[in-house]
């Protein structure tokens, strides 16, 4: 007689089978799901009366099922559903349940948060006092790397001086000394140092080493002194001179070998030129021209006067007062016996003096100033030995020739060039009949030019093209080759 437990189990199976509208064969067909786990199969067969062989045969026996038309489901019930049908008898193990749950659980995508810049309503209702306090603490504790003296720097206020470069006894720049006092007061007010920036302020700049900053060259080689001379700022030039520990800094050349004195001459700044000369500026440009050479070429009378007039006692005394702190090398002390007319005899790299440059440019007023300061009017230039009178004849400048003949008492009409030609002979060779008549009236010796290869045809051959054709002809070298033409490659 079957036990009550087995009868209850059989009734439960029958009820589940009827509810799912499945046949007994379908229930037996579910056996392979549990058959995959031998322990589960053994437990099932033990509870059903130990008919393992019959149940296995029933499972292995092929069955035919009615496939629904709506879906392609084969009719098998998955593991979790079969566990409900089989109730306590057919229960998969924990590993099988975990695997099924992982397969059935959908993968959740990570939410993508896009910041639209709109403040949520929750954030709007937050305590603004706390947020403000946090942000303020962050601002106070942040180190931006900017020195405090840079933030507190300002221009002239209430008539205060921007700097104290004009005071000979001062040793510090005013802006930096103000910072030191403000730093001391800040330190007394805040001894703990909370909220202070970590970057320490730079040390005060002394006048003794400030020239290193103010005499740096830019991409064109110009220093602040060059730029100040171009702009015509006399006060800035004087302040830069006071900072220079040695006069050689005033002779720094730019990329075209121009010093501040050259730029002052080119821009017609006589006052700046005078200051630079008192401070000991000199040196030539890339063509060997001094500031006086450039002024003679440009015809600037005021600049020429500033460069040729001797220093007065007042100027020398003022120079000692302003620049005496760096005169230990006798750069300024030598001004007491310096004489500027000595510079009138300096030649440039073409061998030309100031009188030659002024004569070539036709500046009679400049020549008058040079002659009044003792310039040699009979000086010969370095290339061919021409004097200013030869230059006037070559350019057929009657006004210049009349000035030289009338006002220059030391003019020598018989001064010859390196080729031995006087002014009258030079006029004959150049076919300047008007100039010959002027010289004859002034008492020049009417001597014909000496027999030489220097004639009017040679002057025409000075053209570059004719010179090339002349030397390009092999017959030109016949006389130098023993009568045999020289082959020119």
Swiss-Prot record:
Q: According to the UniProt record, which cysteines are disulfide-bonded?
A: none
Stored InterPro entries: Ankyrin_rpt, Ankyrin_rpt-contain_sf, NF-kappa-B_inhibitor
The ANK repeat ranges on this chain: 220-252, 256-285, 287-316, 350-379, 384-413
Q: According to its UniProt record, where is this protein mainly located?
A: cytoplasm
This entry carries the following GO cellular component terms, namely: cytoplasm; cytosol; neuromuscular junction; subsynaptic reticulum
Q: Which residues carry this modification: Phosphoserine?
A: 45, 135, 384
Single GO BP term: negative regulation of Toll signaling pathway
Keywords recorded for this protein, A-Z: ANK repeat, Cytoplasm, Developmental protein, Phosphoprotein, Repeat
Which PROSITE patterns does the UniProt record give? ANK_REP_REGION (PS50297), ANK_REPEAT (PS50088)
Q: Where in the cell is it found?
A: Cytoplasm
The family database entries (PANTHER family) matched by this protein are listed as:
NF-KAPPA-B INHIBITOR ALPHA (PTHR46680), NF-KAPPA-B INHIBITOR CACTUS (PTHR46680:SF3)
What role does this protein play?
A: Involved in the formation of the dorsoventral pattern. It inhibits nuclear translocation of the dorsal morphogen in the dorsal region of the embryo.
Q: What is this protein called?
A: NF-kappa-B inhibitor cactus
* Originating organism: Drosophila yakuba
């Amino acid at each position: 007689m079957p036990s009550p437990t087995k009868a209850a189990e059989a009734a439960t199976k029958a009820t589940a089978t009827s509810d799912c509208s499945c046949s007994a064969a379908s229930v037996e067909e579910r056996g392979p799901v549990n058959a995959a786990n031998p322990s589960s199969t053994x437990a099932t067969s033990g509870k059903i009366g130990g008919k393992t062989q019959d149940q296995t045969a029933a499972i292995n026996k092929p069955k035919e099922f009615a496939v629904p038309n709506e879906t392609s489901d084969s009719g098998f019930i998955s593991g979790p559903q079969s566990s409900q049908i089989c109730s306590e008898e057919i229960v998969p193990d924990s590993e099988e349940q975990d695997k099924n749950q992982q397969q059935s659980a959908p993968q959740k995508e990570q939410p993508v948060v896009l910041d639209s810049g709109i403040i949520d309503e929750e954030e709007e209702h937050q305590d603004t006092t706390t947020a403000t306090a946090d942000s303020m603490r962050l601002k106070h504790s942040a180190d931006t790397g900017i020195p405090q003296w840079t933030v507190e720097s300002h221009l002239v206020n209430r008539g205060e001086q921007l700097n104290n470069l004009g005071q000979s006894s001062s040793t510090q720049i005013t802006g930096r000394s103000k910072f030191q006092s403000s730093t001391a007061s800040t330190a007394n007010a805040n001894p703990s140092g909370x909220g202070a920036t970590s970057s320490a302020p730079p040390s005060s700049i002394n006048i003794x080493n400030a020239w290193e900053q103010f005499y740096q060259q830019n991409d064109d080689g110009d220093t602040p002194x060059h730029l100040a001379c171009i702009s015509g700022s006399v006060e800035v030039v004087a302040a830069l001179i006071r900072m220079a520990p040695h006069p050689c800094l005033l002779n720094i050349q730019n990329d075209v070998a121009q010093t501040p004195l050259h730029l002052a001459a080119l821009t017609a700044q006589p006052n700046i030129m005078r200051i630079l000369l008192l401070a000991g500026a000199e040196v030539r440009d890339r063509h060997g021209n001094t500031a006086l050479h450039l002024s003679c070429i440009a015809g600037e009378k005021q600049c020429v006067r500033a460069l040729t007039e001797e220093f007065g006692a007042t100027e020398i005394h003022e120079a000692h007062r302003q620049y005496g702190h760096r005169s230990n090398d006798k750069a300024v002390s030598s001004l007491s016996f310096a004489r500027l007319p000595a510079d009138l005899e300096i030649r440039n790299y073409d061998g030309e003096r100031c009188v030659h440059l002024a004569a070539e440019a036709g500046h009679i007023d400049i020549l008058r100033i040079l002659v009044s300061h003792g310039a040699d009017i009979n000086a010969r230039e370095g290339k061919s030995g021409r004097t200013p009178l030869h230059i006037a004849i070559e350019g057929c400048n009657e006004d210049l020739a009349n000035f030289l003949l009338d006002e220059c008492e030391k003019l020598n009409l018989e001064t010859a060039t390196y080729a031995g030609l006087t002014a009258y002979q030079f006029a004959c060779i150049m076919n300047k009949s008007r100039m010959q008549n002027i010289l004859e009236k002034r008492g020049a010796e009417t001597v014909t030019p000496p027999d030489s290869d220097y004639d009017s045809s040679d002057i025409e051959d000075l053209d570059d093209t004719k010179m090339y054709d002349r030397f390009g002809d092999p017959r030109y070298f016949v006389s130098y080759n023993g009568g045999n033409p020289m082959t020119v490659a």
